[in-house]
C-alpha cells in the first residue's frame, strides 16, 4: 500500500512539474545599450525614459512608464555616461559608433545630437542622426566628432514585449586620429 501511495505521489509530482517547462525570459524593461567607437572605447547606458509592456505568459500583459529627465537637463550632466571621441584632423570627418542592445535588438533606432554648449537649454533644437541596422542586430551611426550630447531613441514590437526607450550619453574629445575610419 505504501508503495502504491508513493508511486501515485511521484506521478502527481511529475505531472505537476511537466507544466513547468523552461520558460522563455521576457524582457520586463528596456535593455541596456552599449555604445562603442572605432577605437573600442565604450560606455554602457540605461534608458532614462521609456514606455514598456510585456506578456505575463497567461494571456495578460503588464507594463511601466518611466519619465526621465530631458537629455539636456543640467542636473544630469554629471551622471550622464561619457564616450571618449577622438579629435578629428578634418572638420568634415565623422566617426562610426556601434549601438548594441545585446540579444534584444530594437526594430528601429534614431539619434538626436546637441552641441555641448546646450547643457541646461531644454529648448535647444537637436540635429537628427540616422542609424543603420547591421546583420548581427547591432546598429551603426556616424557621429559628429565633437563634444556633445546624444539621445538614442529605440523602439521594439515583438509578441513578448514592446515599447520605446530613450538613452542619453555625451561625447567628449579624446586623442587625435588621422585618416578615415
Please report, for each region that a protein language model flagged, where it lies by residue.
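Edge beta-strands of extracellular beta-sandwich domains
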Residues: 160-173
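Bacterial signal peptide processing site
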Residues: 21-23
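Conserved structural position at the C-terminal beta-strand
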Residues: 154-156
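C-terminal motif of bacterial Sec signal peptides marking the signal peptidase cleavage site
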Residues: 16-19
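Mature extracytoplasmic domains of secretory-pathway proteins
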Residues: 52-120
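Short beta-strand segments within Ig-like beta-sandwich modules, predominantly Fibronectin type-III
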Residues: 128-135
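Surface-exposed, short loops/turns at beta-strand junctions within beta-sandwich domains
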Residues: 140-149
Amino acid at each position: 500500500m505504501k508503495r502504491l501511495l508513493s508511486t501515485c505521489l511521484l506521478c502527481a509530482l511529475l505531472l505537476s512539474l511537466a507544466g513547468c517547462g523552461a520558460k522563455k525570459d521576457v524582457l520586463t524593461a528596456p535593455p541596456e545599450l552599449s555604445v562603442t567607437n572605432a577605437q573600442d572605447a565604450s560606455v554602457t547606458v540605461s534608458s532614462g525614459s521609456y514606455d514598456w509592456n510585456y506578456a505575463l505568459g497567461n494571456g495578460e500583459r503588464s507594463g511601466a512608464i518611466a519619465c526621465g529627465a530631458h537629455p539636456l537637463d543640467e542636473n544630469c550632466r554629471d551622471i550622464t555616461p561619457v564616450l571618449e571621441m577622438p579629435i578629428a584632423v578634418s572638420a568634415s570627418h565623422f566617426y562610426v559608433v556601434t549601438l548594441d542592445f545585446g540579444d534584444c535588438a530594437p526594430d528601429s533606432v534614431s539619434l538626436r545630437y546637441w552641441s555641448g554648449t546646450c547643457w541646461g537649454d531644454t529648448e535647444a533644437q537637436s540635429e537628427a542622426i540616422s542609424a543603420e541596422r547591421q546583420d548581427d542586430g547591432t546598429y551603426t551611426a556616424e557621429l559628429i566628432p565633437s563634444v556633445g550630447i546624444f539621445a538614442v531613441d529605440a523602439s521594439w514590437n515583438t509578441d513578448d514585449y514592446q515599447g520605446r526607450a530613450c538613452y542619453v550619453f555625451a561625447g567628449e574629445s579624446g586623442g587625435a586620429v588621422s585618416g578615415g575610419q
